[in-house]
């Protein structure tokens, strides 16, 4: 933010504008329109494949391992949303039968699938693979596929799952050792898993990788499933590109690139985030609302972080709290642009939701936005005063400025199943939401620390931690990493039945945590610098279709 505060806006203010790179995409997505003939052709071919897949799923008399493998393959191929009821019923039956297995592969796959679907299966299933000292048997080292599944299972652990801490360490060491000597496609699958475990990955990104890099190359592949998955991916991609074209036109009409040149132009990356929250066709309206919200709050973030003066930001904060277009005259010209755009956007949301009698829920998102802006203003005050708060004070403010309370709430707007009671539950910051927010905060803080430090910000999470605990930068980052691990256990716990809201409404909260893991992988700021991280994902999901 600018450090000079003046009473007269006519006076020239020297602003330390952050030098953000322009959009990588230009007008690339602006003019896409669905080829209805191709879309209809894909949809017609999908129907019989879908029914064949359903028949495979509900067939009886299969071995446990074959049933689990089929479900896992369908989920990894990104087509399980067609069969949620069938899969849940099968897993419910398996769980209630106390199904067990003697081999590592089946046990680990059983454990992960049940946990990911909310069934609290005991980690004691793994005790048979330990020796008398409680260590995993070295004889397992040669079972690479079993180890890979043990590794993936270890990431759904909760606080009560100490055995899975050992499982993670054991499987990681042996997979790293085995990886260079494996044949394709297992080699690629192991290398990818070590880089990005399945449970913390963005579902569409994982699906794209699995179809193209793994399943197509597997000798044992099922051609019905593969064909179905490719057609479904390409058909959904058309819908996603159409949504992005709509949002790109909205963004271009706002013309923030010209009128607010200090801010990041990242509407495509914002769409990737919304797509990470939910990709299924029934959430089209929800996605468009969410991407517009993320794009808008990004502008507000940069206004506080890289442009506004203290006095301007205080006035802007007050105007947002009042939420009244008549407040606009108090603002400097550049702030009038975003203020009007924000109020217009929420009027549009109310209008859009009114036909379903849901316009009243928009107020929940507005209150969350007011909260974010209040907390942005606190951060800007700390910056100008050179104040470094204790870690606890820092976090009490900084959790809201992740925008994740706000985005989780916004993600429910276009979800037709979300009721007033669900919004009330979310407004109380339940533990699972708190966990997702903490994951975002500490991963973001670690990745952006050096850049924020170079811009003179001392009230960063890492700096506050270093001072509070008298530790080095690396030790502070390790503490933050440990906070993320603890939060993941809380989040995983929050997915276990019985849950206060439906699994459908918990999934966006989980996916928000996944997105931040992917965007800031290897401590890179993939949002500010998308060329480093997000560009290949965006190309894979929104530019290149899968060859049929």
UniProtKB/Swiss-Prot annotation:
This is Probable 5-epi-aristolochene synthase 4. The keyword Metal-binding applies. One of its GO terms (cellular component) is cytoplasm. The lineage of its organism: Eukaryota, Viridiplantae, Streptophyta, Embryophyta, Tracheophyta. Pathway: Secondary metabolite biosynthesis; terpenoid biosynthesis. The keyword Nucleus does not apply. GO terms for molecular function: 5-epi-aristolochene synthase activity; magnesium ion binding; terpene synthase activity. Its EC number is 4.2.3.61. Its cofactor is Mg(2+). It comes from Nicotiana attenuata (Coyote tobacco). Catalyzes the cyclization of trans,trans-farnesyl diphosphate (FPP) to the bicyclic intermediate 5-epi-aristolochene, initial step in the conversion of FPP to the sesquiterpenoid antifungal phytoalexin capsidiol. Produces germacrene A as an enzyme-bound intermediate that is not released by the enzyme, but is further cyclized to produce the bicyclic 5-epi-aristolochene. One of its GO terms (biological process) is diterpenoid biosynthetic process. It is found in: Cytoplasm. A motif (DDXXD motif) lies at residues 301-305.
């Amino acid at each position: 933010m600018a450090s000079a505060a003046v009473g007269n806006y006519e006076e020239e203010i020297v602003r330390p504008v952050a030098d953000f790179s322009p959009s990588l995409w230009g007008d690339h997505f602006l003019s896409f329109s669905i080829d209805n003939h191709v879309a209809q052709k894909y949809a017609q071919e999908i129907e019989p494949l879908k029914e064949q897949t359903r028949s495979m799923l509900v067939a009886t008399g299969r071995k446990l391992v074959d049933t689990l493998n089929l479900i896992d393959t369908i989920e990894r191929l990104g087509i399980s949303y067609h069969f949620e009821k069938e899969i849940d019923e099968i897993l419910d039956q398996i769980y209630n039968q106390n199904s067990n297995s003697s081999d590592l592969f089946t046990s680990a796959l059983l454990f992960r699938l049940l946990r990911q679907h909310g069934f609290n299966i005991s980690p004691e299933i793994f005790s048979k693979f330990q020796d008398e000292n409680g260590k995993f048997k070295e004889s397992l080292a040669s079972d690479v596929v079993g180890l890979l599944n043990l590794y993936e299972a270890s990431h759904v652990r909760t606080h009560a799952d100490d055995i899975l801490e050992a499982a993670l360490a054991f499987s990681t060491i042996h997979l790293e050792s085995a990886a260079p000597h494996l044949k394709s496609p297992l080699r690629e699958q192991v290398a990818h898993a070590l880089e990005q475990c399945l449970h913390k990955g963005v579902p569409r990104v994982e699906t794209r990788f699995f179809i193209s890099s793994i399943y197509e190359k597997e000798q044992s592949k099922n051609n019905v499933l593969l064909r179905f998955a490719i057609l479904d991916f390409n058909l959904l991609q058309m819908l996603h590109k159409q949504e992005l074209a709509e949002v790109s036109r909205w963004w271009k009409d706002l013309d923030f690139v010209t009128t607010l040149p200090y801010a990041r132009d990242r509407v495509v990356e914002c769409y990737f985030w919304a797509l990470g929250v939910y990709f299924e066709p029934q959430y089209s309206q929800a996605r468009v609302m969410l991407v517009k919200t993320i794009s808008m709050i990004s502008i507000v973030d940069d206004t506080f972080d890289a442009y506004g003066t203290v006095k301007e930001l205080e006035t802007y904060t007050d105007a947002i709290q009042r939420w009244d277009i008549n407040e606009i005259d108090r603002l400097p010209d550049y702030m009038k642009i975003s203020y009007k755009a924000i109020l217009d956007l929420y009027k549009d949301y109310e209008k859009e939701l009114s036909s379903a009698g849901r316009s009243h829920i928009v107020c929940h998102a507005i209150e969350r936005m007011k909260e974010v802006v209040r907390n942005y203003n606190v951060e800007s005050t700390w910056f100008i005063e050179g104040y470094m708060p204790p870690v606890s004070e820092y976090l009490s403010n900084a959790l809201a400025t992740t925008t994740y309370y706000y985005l989780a709430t916004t993600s429910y707007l276009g979800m037709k199943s979300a009721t007033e009671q669900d919004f009330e539950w979310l407004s109380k910051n339940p533990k699972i939401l708190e966990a997702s927010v903490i994951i975002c905060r500490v991963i973001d803080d670690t990745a952006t620390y050096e850049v924020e430090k170079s811009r003179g910000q001392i009230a960063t999470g890492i700096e506050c931690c270093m001072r509070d605990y008298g530790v080095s930068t690396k030790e502070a980052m390790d503490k933050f990493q440990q906070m993320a691990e603890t939060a993941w256990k809380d989040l995983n716990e929050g997915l276990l039945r019985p849950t206060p809201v439906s699994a459908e409404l918990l999934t966006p909260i989980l996916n928000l945590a996944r997105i931040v893991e992917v965007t800031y992988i290897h401590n890179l700021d993939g949002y500010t610098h998308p060329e480093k991280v997000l560009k290949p994902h965006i190309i894979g999901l929104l530019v290149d279709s899968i060859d049929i």
